[in-house]
């Protein structure tokens, strides 16, 4: 139910949202489908869309400035790992690219085929970046005898709540994988 809501944000993969919007009694309900790809550029684009609907553009610009500052600090910490060869889960691509990793192969979600695993190993990765919520690629790291890390693309793990938390968490996991 959307009773009492003024705005509904959704990612587009929630099958029930269009029907709920259509049948809502609240005819003044604003809805906005957003792209949930966790890259800094996309997150800022989506924040701007939301701010426009909520008439909070000034607050969004202030947040964006803080966010960019924090990202810059995190990238300094990640700079020693820039250019490392990485086999990356599809949903970890935005973070991996932002972190400066050299993505040599992208692993799709779902079951891996023997050919896909062999191809990934042949790329001689320094690291496999998997997604915590749908991990599939540990077998590649084990067989390639390289480092392995799981990252997140939405908050929840270890008290992550904000967009900044996602980047803090993922950055710390990447650094730990090389210790």
What are these regions, as identified by a protein language model?
Residues 7-11, 87, 126-132:
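Periplasmic-binding protein-like
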């Amino acid at each position: 139910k959307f009773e009492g809501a003024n705005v509904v944000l959704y990612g587009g993969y929630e099958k029930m949202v269009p029907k709920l919007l259509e049948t809502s009694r609240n005819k003044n309900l604003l809805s906005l489908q957003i792209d949930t790809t966790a890259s800094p550029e996309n997150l800022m684009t989506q924040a701007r869309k939301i701010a426009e609907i909520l008439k909070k553009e000034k607050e969004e610009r202030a947040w964006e400035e803080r966010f960019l500052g924090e990202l810059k600090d995190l990238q300094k910490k990640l700079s020693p790992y820039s250019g490392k060869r990485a086999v990356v889960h599809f949903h970890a691509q935005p973070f991996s690219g932002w972190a400066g990793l050299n993505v040599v192969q992208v692993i799709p979600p779902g079951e891996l085929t023997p050919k896909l695993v062999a191809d990934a190993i042949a790329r001689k990765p320094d690291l496999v970046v998997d997604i915590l919520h749908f991990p599939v690629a540990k077998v590649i790291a084990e067989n390639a005898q390289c480092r392995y890390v799981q990252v997140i693309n939405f908050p929840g793990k270890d008290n992550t709540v904000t967009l900044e938390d996602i980047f803090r968490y993922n950055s710390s996991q990447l650094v730990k994988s090389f210790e």
